[in-house]
Amino acid sequence: MFISFEGTEGVGKTTLIRKIHQHFEEQGKQVVLTREPGGTPLAEQIRSMLLAVNHDENMSHDTELLLIYAARAQHLQQVILPALESNKIVLSDRFTDASFAYQCSGRGLSQDKLQLLNQNFVSRMPEVTFWLDAPIELGMNRARERGALDRFEQEKLSFFTKVREGYETLWKAEPERIKRLDATQSPDQVFEQALQYLA
């Protein structure tokens, strides 16, 4: 089983992933916990490039998208597909839906570009995607409490509003796969809501 976790900054994805990871392990199941961008040594190097705040050069939106997919291709081949072939459960902090929400809805890139990349480099989609949804202001306040903000977290409120709208578009288009979780609830309540979809 392949499960991805999506949402804007500070909505509690990491906390939920840890809880679900523990839940499956207590059932004696083998679980792989991973993230995007990242998940392999090479993909983590790309992640560092993507998140770094570079005052000397602005990263173009196309470059950002291509770097994310370079990391994703490596991640799929090295981690996700081998784990699924071994009948392990894969829990991924973000996957292709993040690219639609952030790069297409947020940045305004063409969906055709994303579709082309998905067709050529993404051979497996999650069976279940949890979208943790909360007001942008709430999530950003939580993100600020964590400390220094990365390149994405420093974006304006209007950007994250578009990202959230992108996630909502996906959720309405694919309600069977994408499950919206109310991230204004406590971590335990979010976990209980998620478990209902995994029963």
UniProtKB/Swiss-Prot annotation:
Catalytic reaction(s) noted: dTMP + ATP = dTDP + ADP
Gene3D superfamilies: P-loop containing nucleotide triphosphate hydrolases
GO cellular component terms listed in the entry, alphabetical order: cytosol
Transmembrane segments: none
GO biological process, any: dTTP biosynthetic process
Entry's EC annotation: 2.7.4.9
CDD domains, sorted: TMPK
Assigned keywords, A-Z: ATP-binding, Kinase, Nucleotide biosynthesis, Nucleotide-binding, Transferase
Keyword Glycoprotein assigned: no
Binding site for ATP: G7, T8, E9, G10, V11, G12, K13, T14
Database matches in InterPro entries: P-loop_NTPase (IPR027417), Thymidylate_kin-like_dom (IPR039430), Thymidylate_kinase (IPR018094)
Any Pfam family: Thymidylate_kin
GO molecular function, one term: ATP binding
Enzyme class: transferase
Known function: Phosphorylation of dTMP to form dTDP in both de novo and salvage pathways of dTTP synthesis.
Homology family: Belongs to the thymidylate kinase family.
Protein name per UniProt: Thymidylate kinase
The organism of origin for this protein: Acinetobacter baumannii (strain SDF)
Gene: tmk
